[in-house]
């Protein structure tokens, strides 16, 4: 036989038959080897044809294997290694297969021709086929359903058989099987799609919208309407096939193979005479799909059929990809009619989630409160700005349910703690058992008593946990059963099987509903007691997930955080000394935000800190970050002195398209996208170019900036602090006796500020805060703070440092300069105190656990070790 006259799959089967013969030590390849080789290919055509005939594949395989085992095997020195003979029976089989191919007017011998030849085989194989009721007529019937009217004209025809089933999925069948979630709302879009599909020509809608707004769901909604027969007469018996472009392209190694597969799909649709609607999700993938040198891409192959109305196609793609790929090909674009899928409102999202609630409850085995659904819609809309409803709200509910589900399946915390304590005591018991002294024996008795008590508690808790788990699983199983019965009822009513429908509606379903109600009431009754497991998803869980995703504290305040916020002003005052007004205004803004009464469309607070250098402007920003986030690293600090040139603006929001660094994004926008809840410090703003402030206008007023890539960056959860030295000379000169700023000095500073910044910029800032120069009393407090920081650095060596009052006075006099603020003081302490301590430490005079006193002698600081 000429192998070139066979298809690739037939050649592969003959090679596999040879391998089987070698592995069984047979000297010749027979028909039974070929039969088993065909059956062992899982997704092969032979298996598909036998499945269509309802043949038991495993029984057929076992029969073939037992026939192979009967064949004589040759091993040992007499065996001719590497020599295989083809039996005359196999040669005759292949000749018969060739004749079958001629009868069917095929150019190549394919797997189906070999199967038809097998049906005429005599002997053992004939007996096996007769036992399993395999006849030539049955084979031909099944072959026609798989192959249709296609002829074998290439060496890989199997790829074109049942093309739709292989490269797509039937959405209508999936709806009938209950695999698709219900689609709530979207009626206007579904009606528009139905209107376009009912046209004579150009009846191809394309759904365009942002990712996550529910484009695919609209098509699933149409499939559900087709199942319910809630569509016009022309669409009643239609089915929707979702085409899988990746499956179509995958494995197409040779030129023309991809086109052949796609053509087979299109031919099947054409033969259906409008019964099949083709749904292509991610429609832009057809542009350029399968395009190689001289080949035609999928888009161009679809155009003629789309224009003639032979192909009913529904597309779905995002706005950006539609513009980028489809609009570039006007001939393809004009064949589609756009249907814009808008993002649903928060109210619509709540309705969608209420419709999906039952499916989530059945899948996860939890109860979802209605408050959780409302919270998911509202919080996702407010805090997750880079994604779209309803997708982000559905994800929130799903993750919250999954959190509760994993808690149900894992050991409760209370039981886990008791179990660990038991393990710890058992280890201690084993160690004490080896000791003989009286004290150890007494301790052992006490320990054994505690251990037996704990084991009793643990066994009680474990039994309670198992019972609660069992109850939850029972409710979940009943819900699943009820869901199945409701699906069966829909199917029975659709098929007018009235007996079955009546039995379900009036018999089985009410019985299960009653049982479910009793189980839920029992669970509600048990809830009054102290339960180990939670099975409710409430708004707290949703808020917790939002906080985890974004880092923004949305969850209800726990007691510790409540106290911390009420003490925020005091905490800030401990580190920022002498600036009561600034501390008070900043802490008030944070309190308003966490209480939830701030304007949701503006930042938490925006402040300009004015004052001389070294009075605590930057320190307050750092302290605020430390207090709110337990880390100064959470502060986004931008030194505005780096933005002196006009073109430096692009570094804040990203370089424009075509410039180097376009892909990298801006320093400010990227930092806030990563950490939406943070303190943004714009240091030394008067040094920046005036153009920079135009960028900040939207940030201060609407709490958002659009970066160079067109993404909206949300600043609504940031505290924006800008520092400046403008007018510091007036502040230094204009102090009252009590340390407050004179009114005329305040006016002079504000006048200078208005001269430097535009009114529209200053008008958008919440507060302009003047930092007053530090007085001598405040400087003493700063000395204490510096010494405290030094002690913190020496804490691991248990060395304490103390400055006498005289030493403090001396440091204040020698180190403080009103013009430069507290920074020279820090440098002085570093030079005069820290250096002396370092010398003594290296010399070994100061050892660990020492108490060091710094005093003044002969107008000089000295160190005494105690």
From Swiss-Prot:
Annotated residues for binding of ATP 2: 611-618
Residue segments, region Linker: 344-551
Database matches in InterPro entries: AAA+_ATPase, ATPase_AAA_core, Chaperonin_ClpB, Clp_ATPase_C, Clp_N_dom_sf, Clp_R_dom, ClpA/B, ClpA/B_CS1
Keywords assigned by UniProt, alphabetized: ATP-binding, Chaperone, Coiled coil, Cytoplasm, Nucleotide-binding, Repeat, Stress response
Record region (Repeat 2): 86-149
Gene Ontology annotations for the cellular component aspect, listed alphabetically: cytoplasm
Pfam families assigned to the protein according to its UniProt record, in alphabetical order: AAA (PF00004), AAA_2 (PF07724), AAA_lid_9 (PF17871), Clp_N (PF02861), ClpB_D2-small (PF10431)
Region annotation C-terminal: where it falls in the sequence: 774-866
GO biological process terms held by the UniProt record: cellular response to heat; protein refolding
Keyword Transmembrane recorded: no
Domain of life: Bacteria
Amino-acid positions noted as binding ATP 1 in the UniProt annotation, renumbered to this chain: 209-216
Function: Part of a stress-induced multi-chaperone system, it is involved in the recovery of the cell from heat-induced damage, in cooperation with DnaK, DnaJ and GrpE. Acts before DnaK, in the processing of protein aggregates. Protein binding stimulates the ATPase activity; ATP hydrolysis unfolds the denatured protein aggregates, which probably helps expose new hydrophobic binding sites on the surface of ClpB-bound aggregates, contributing to the solubilization and refolding of denatured protein aggregates by DnaK.
Domain commentary: The Clp repeat (R) domain probably functions as a substrate-discriminating domain, recruiting aggregated proteins to the ClpB hexamer and/or stabilizing bound proteins. The NBD2 domain is responsible for oligomerization, whereas the NBD1 domain stabilizes the hexamer probably in an ATP-dependent manner. The movement of the coiled-coil domain is essential for ClpB ability to rescue proteins from an aggregated state, probably by pulling apart large aggregated proteins, which are bound between the coiled-coils motifs of adjacent ClpB subunits in the functional hexamer.
Official protein name in the record: Chaperone protein ClpB
């Amino acid at each position: 036989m000429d192998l070139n006259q066979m298809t690739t799959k037939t050649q592969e089967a003959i090679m596999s038959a040879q391998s089987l013969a070698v592995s069984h030590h047979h000297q010749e390849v027979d028909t039974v080897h070929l039969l088993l080789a065909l059956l062992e290919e899982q997704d092969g055509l032979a298996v598909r044809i036998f499945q269509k005939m309802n043949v038991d594949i495993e029984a057929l395989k076992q029969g073939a294997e037992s026939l192979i085992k009967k064949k004589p095997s040759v091993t040992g020195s007499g065996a001719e290694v590497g020599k295989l003979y083809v039996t005359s029976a196999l040669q005759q089989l292949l000749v018969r297969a060739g004749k079958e191919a001629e009868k069917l007017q095929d150019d190549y011998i394919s797997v189906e021709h070999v199967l038809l030849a097998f049906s005429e085989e005599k002997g053992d194989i004939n007996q096996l086929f007769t036992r399993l009721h395999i006849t030539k007529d049955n084979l031909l019937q099944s072959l026609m359903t798989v192959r249709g009217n296609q002829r074998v004209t290439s060496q890989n025809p199997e790829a074109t058989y049942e093309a739709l089933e292989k490269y797509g999925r039937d959405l209508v069948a999936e709806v009938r099987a209950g695999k698709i979630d219900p689609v709530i709302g979207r009626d206007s879009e579904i009606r528009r799609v139905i209107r376009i599909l009912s046209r004579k020509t150009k009846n191809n809608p394309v759904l365009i919208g942002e990712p996550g707004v529910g484009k695919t769901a609209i098509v699933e909604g149409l499939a559900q309407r087709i199942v319910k027969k809630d569509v016009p007469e022309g669409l009643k018996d239609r089915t929707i096939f979702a085409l899988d472009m990746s499956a179509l392209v995958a494995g197409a190694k040779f030129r023309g193979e991809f086109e052949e597969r796609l053509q087979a799909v299109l031919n099947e649709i054409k033969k259906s005479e409008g019964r099949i609607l083709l749904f292509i999700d991610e429609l832009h993938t057809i542009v350029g799909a399968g395009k190689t040198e001289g080949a035609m891409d999928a888009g161009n192959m679809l155009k003629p059929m789309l224009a003639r109305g032979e192909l009913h196609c529904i597309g779905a793609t995002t706005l950006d990809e539609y513009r980028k790929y489809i609009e570039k090909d006007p001939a393809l674009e004009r064949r589609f009619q756009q249907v814009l899928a808008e993002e649903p409102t928060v109210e619509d999202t709540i309705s969608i989630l209420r419709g999906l609630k039952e499916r989530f409850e059945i899948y996860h085995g939890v109860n979802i409160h209605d408050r959780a659904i409302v919270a998911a819609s509202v919080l996702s809309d407010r805090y997750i700005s880079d994604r779209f409803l309803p997708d982000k709200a559905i994800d929130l509910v799903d993750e919250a349910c999954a959190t509760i589900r994993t808690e149900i399946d894992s050991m409760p915390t209370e039981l886990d703690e008791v179990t660990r304590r038991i393990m710890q005591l058992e280890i201690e018991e084993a160690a004490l058992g080896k000791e003989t002294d009286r004290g150890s024996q007494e301790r052992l008795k006490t320990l054994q008593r505690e251990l037996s008590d704990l084991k009793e508690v643990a066994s009680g808790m474990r039994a309670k946990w198992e019972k609660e788990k069992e109850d939850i699983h029972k409710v979940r199983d009943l819900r699943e059963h009820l869901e199945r019965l409701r699906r069966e009822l829909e199917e029975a009513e659709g098929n007018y099987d009235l007996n079955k429908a009546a039995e379900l509606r009036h018999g089985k379903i009410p019985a299960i509903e009653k049982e479910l109600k009793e189980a839920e009431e029992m669970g509600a009754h048990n809830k009054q007691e102290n339960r180990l497991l939670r099975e409710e998803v409430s708004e707290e869980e949703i808020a917790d997930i939002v906080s985890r995703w974004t880092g923004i504290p949305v969850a209800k305040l726990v007691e510790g955080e409540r106290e911390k916020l009420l003490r925020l002003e005091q905490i800030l005052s401990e580190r920022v000394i002498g600036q009561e007004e600034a501390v008070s205004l900043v802490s008030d803004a944070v309190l308003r935000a966490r209480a939830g009464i701030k304007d949701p469309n503006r930042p938490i607070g925006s402040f300009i800190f004015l004052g001389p250098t070294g009075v605590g402007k930057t320190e307050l920003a750092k302290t605020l970050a430390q207090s709110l986030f337990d880390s100064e690293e959470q502060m986004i600090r931008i030194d505005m002195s780096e933005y002196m040139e006009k073109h430096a603006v692009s570094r804040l929001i990203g370089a424009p398209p075509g410039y180097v660094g376009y892909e990298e994004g801006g320093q400010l926008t990227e930092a806030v996208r990563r950490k939406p809840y943070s303190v943004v410090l714009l240091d030394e703003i008067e040094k920046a170019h005036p153009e920079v402030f135009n960028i900040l206008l939207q940030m201060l007023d609407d709490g958002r900036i659009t970066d160079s890539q067109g993404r909206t960056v949300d600043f609504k959860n940031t505290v924006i602090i800008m520092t400046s030295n403008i007018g510091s000379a007036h502040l230094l000169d204009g102090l009252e006796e009590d340390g407050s700023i004179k009114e005329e000095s305040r006016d002079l500073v504000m006048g200078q500020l208005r001269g430097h910044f535009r009114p529209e910029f200053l008008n958008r800032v919440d507060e302009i805060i003047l930092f007053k120069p530090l007085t001598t009393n405040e400087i003493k407090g700063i000395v204490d703070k510096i010494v405290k920081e030094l002690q913190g650095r020496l804490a691991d060596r248990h060395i304490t440092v103390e400055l006498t009052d005289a030493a403090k006075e001396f440091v204040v006099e020698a180190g403080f300069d009103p013009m430069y603020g507290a920074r020279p003081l820090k440098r002085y302490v570093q030079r005069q105190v820290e250096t002396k301590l370092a010398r003594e430490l290296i010399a070994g005079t100061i050892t660990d656990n020492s108490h060091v006193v710094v005093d003044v002698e002969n107008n000089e600081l000295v160190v005494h070790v105690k």
